[in-house]
């Protein structure tokens, strides 16, 4: 998923970026757990 377009609401994209980063960390943690 790679769409880095400058949207009018930069805050939303920032929150989405943080969310995806957080989810990736969870996935990595789950991978290490199992």
Curated annotation (Swiss-Prot):
Name listed for the protein in its UniProt record: Uncharacterized protein HI_0870
Organism in which the protein naturally occurs: Haemophilus influenzae (strain ATCC 51907 / DSM 11121 / KW20 / Rd)
């Amino acid at each position: 998923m790679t769409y880095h377009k400058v949207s009018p609401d930069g805050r939303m994209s920032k929150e989405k970026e943080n969310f995806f980063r957080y989810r990736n960390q969870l996935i990595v943690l789950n991978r290490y757990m199992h």
